[in-house]
Amino acid sequence: GHMAISKEPRFIGGVWGPYYSAVLPEYWLNEGGQSATGALIDHVIQSHPCYETLLTQAKSQGQTIYEVLNALLRKMAGEPEDIAFLTRDMHILPYFHGNRSPRANPTLTGAITGLKLSRTPEDMALQYLATIQAIALGTRHIIETMNQSGYTIDTIMASGGGTKNPIFVQEHANATGCAMLLPEESEAMLLGGAMMGTIAAGVFDTFPEAMSAMSRIGKTVTPQTNRIKQYYDRKYRVFHEMYQDHMKY
C-alpha cells in the first residue's frame, strides 16, 4: 500500500480514504495501492522457460533468484547507472490483476511489448527488470494523483520485502523522482508493535514520541541522474499510452 497522512481530510478519486485516526490520532489517512507487486514479479519470472535453471543456480550459490537476476542485470549493463536503459525496447502494463489505484478498475488486464523469440537468462532478467519498472511507474501514477489533491510527496518511507532488493528500491527512486528512506529495522510490524507496547507501559505518552525515539533511517536511496529521469519520463508516457490503447480494444 501507499499511505499518506494529513491534518485535513482529502478526497482523492481512486484512492481509499480519508480515514480519521486510522494510523495516528487526529490525522487523516489516504491509501493507494497496486493489485499485485511481489506476486506480479514472481508470476513473470516463474513463467519464463529459464526459471528452473536460474532457481537451481541460485540454490547452489546460496542466493535468492532475485540476487542472481540482479547480478545478471549488473553484468549486462556494465555500469549501475545503465541498468534502467536495458529495457528501452520492453514495456509492461502491470494490470495483470486489475488496478486498485488510481484507476480503481478490477477488470483491467496487463500487457507486455518488446518480446522476442528468446529463452535465455538475459531475456528473463529483462522481463524481471521491466516488471519492477512498471510497478514503480504505477507508484508514480499514485503519487501524482495524490499530489494533485493537496499532498506534496517527494519522499517515500519504504517498508516490506521490496526494501531488501536494491534494484527494486533504486528503480522506484528513479521512476518516481523521490528519495527512498529505508528503515534501520526492516521488520516494521514488529517495531510498530513494540512502540504500542511502550505507550501502553507509559514509557512514552504519544505515538509521535515513540516513533521519534524508536524508528531510525538506515539508508537513503536517491534518483541517479538527469539522463535516467528523462528516460523514465519517456517510459511513463508509454505506460499511459499502453493503457489508452488497451481501453480502445
Where are these regions (language model features)?
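Active-site core segments that coordinate phosphate-bearing ligands/cofactors
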Residues: 1-159, 164-249
